[in-house]
Amino acid sequence: MPELPEVEVTRRGLLPHVVGRRIAAVTVRHRGLRWPVDPGLEACLAHRLVRRIERRGKYLLLECISADAAQPPGWLLVHLGMTGTLRVLPEAPPPGMHDHFDLLLDAGPAPGMLADTIVLRFRDPRRFGAILWTTLPEAELASHPLLSTLGIEPFDPAFDGAWLHRHTRGRSAAIKTVLLSGAIVVGVGNIYASESLFRAGIRPTTAAGRLSRARCDRLAQAVRDTLAQAIERGGSTLRDFVGSDGASGYFQLDCFVYDRAGLPCRVCATPVRQIVQGQRSTFYCPKCQH
């Protein structure tokens, strides 16, 4: 499943090719995604300009503005689900059975575009992704039902050990489970939770509320470092994920513990252990993490 690093890699890959372009045509082939695609989406998007691409948690937010001042700006919310990708294509090749959505983008008023038209194509074999439209003002966007429950961004300066310590008090759930929930901090998926906890030296089964301030300091830093490294490496490709240019990610090659059950810890050579938490595989070193 694409997590924060994969979504951020996608966002950064789209920026130079998509921002400033005008939506010339919209093609929706399959509306039955995680939530049905709005039947009026084509009309909402037609002839709008893509002004910005932001990210909130695992959602991509494309701000689309109209030349008609009477039309408010809107936001196209895209979630990649478990197997989704957004690709920039120089032309529109014949769609495959899992290619559900295309935006044909022309150069619009933006100078210096390398191609007159490109296609932004959404592919999702399992159809757990989502494409939604909202005209909520930017100041109210955080109140959208899909965004309102999300925790703080891990790269927000406010996210630090003090924040983590304060928001884990009284929580008896395991710290890995708390990280995965996204309620305190967003984007720490299964791979990145295991890796962050290893770097912080914290056993994933430790009750979140028992972490000292010092351990929360280490964990907050480990979360930021792990996610930053994953973004730099293009994310993790375990099965389906590719970036907007079709390139695979390579962070999985750097993992200390994830998917290394029985192999020697890269630090102390103790065999890595695997357990199940909340129906998800967890990997840790019994010597380095306590």
Swiss-Prot record:
Zinc finger (FPG-type) in chain: 256-290
Lineage, opening ranks: Bacteria, Pseudomonadati, Pseudomonadota, Betaproteobacteria, Burkholderiales
GO terms, molecular function: 8-oxo-7,8-dihydroguanine DNA N-glycosylase activity; class I DNA-(apurinic or apyrimidinic site) endonuclease activity; damaged DNA binding; zinc ion binding
Organism: Cupriavidus taiwanensis (strain DSM 17343 / BCRC 17206 / CCUG 44338 / CIP 107171 / LMG 19424 / R1) (Ralstonia taiwanensis (strain LMG 19424))
UniProt-annotated catalytic positions: P2, E3, K58, R280
CDD domains: EcFpg-like_N
Functional note: Involved in base excision repair of DNA damaged by oxidation or by mutagenic agents. Acts as a DNA glycosylase that recognizes and removes damaged bases. Has a preference for oxidized purines, such as 7,8-dihydro-8-oxoguanine (8-oxoG). Has AP (apurinic/apyrimidinic) lyase activity and introduces nicks in the DNA strand. Cleaves the DNA backbone by beta-delta elimination to generate a single-strand break at the site of the removed base with both 3'- and 5'-phosphates.
Protein name: Formamidopyrimidine-DNA glycosylase
Its EC number(s): 3.2.2.23, 4.2.99.18
Binding of DNA, residues: H98, R126, R171
